[in-house]
């Protein structure tokens, strides 16, 4: 790591969000360094040694264990990364007097709601992944009060496996795809989330006081996965990314049993972050159109 005053340290720089953040940070005047698996976030000594190599004023933690079903059989590893790793990073931030941005998830809720979840709503995770992320949030705020936790949902982007990539591939291979129509949420393009993270940093750096704590961010609007798939097909055909006819059919979650029940409703209320930063969040279908255009 370079010895450049006021660095942003991006942890998890090779993940789906981290790769997008790296790309956007490179276009700013903000000095940053990115690390990934070469530094074990479960190893406090390794984190401490890395932190001592440069002055850090911001840490972004986009590292996480995100395999929701696999986590049920891999609970110790999941907890090590999502809870202990998050706690370690927060402690490092506190020791270096850095501000922390920690990425979390809609899975901290049980998905039984009927209105968009607010930041202060009671959490009730139903699986190992959600539980470890919820416990990670608690540890972050305990270990470093100068933390921003951003919960997001239905994340997709250029890098890594995600729903949009899967649908584009399947729709070019099959005559029909079946997609669940009883789970409602809001897609999030990594470009939009990465952009708002950078906006948060720049806003705080400018001297504006943005209260620490939990914030929600997704794209605007809420839909089912079936709705999402239909729009992917529509946009894919219009933009030449899908070159054959493919029927998109609805089905129930019961037809695709999984180890962990997916949230039936995971819409997040974004009023707090919109007010705090004075931002307008793009609609989910607008962002999807731009994403497919860039593929």
Residue ranges and their predicted role:
Residues 6, 283-295:
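Amphipathic terminal alpha-helices
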Residues 6-25:
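N-terminal Rossmann NAD(P)H-binding glycine-rich loop of SDR-like oxidoreductase domains
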Residues 26-49:
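Adenosine-cofactor binding site in Rossmann-like domains, unifying the SAM/SAH pocket
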Residues 44-83, 92:
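NAD(P)H-binding glycine-rich loop region in Rossmannoid oxidoreductase-like domains
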Residues 80, 84-88, 108-150, 154-155:
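Catalytic helix-loop patch of NAD(P)-dependent Rossmann-fold dehydrogenases
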Residues 138-199:
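NAD(P)-dependent short-chain dehydrogenase/reductase
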Residues 158, 183-194, 215-235, 290:
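Substrate-binding strand-loop-helix patch
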Residues 203-257:
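Mid/C-terminal beta-alpha module of Rossmann-like enzyme folds, strongest
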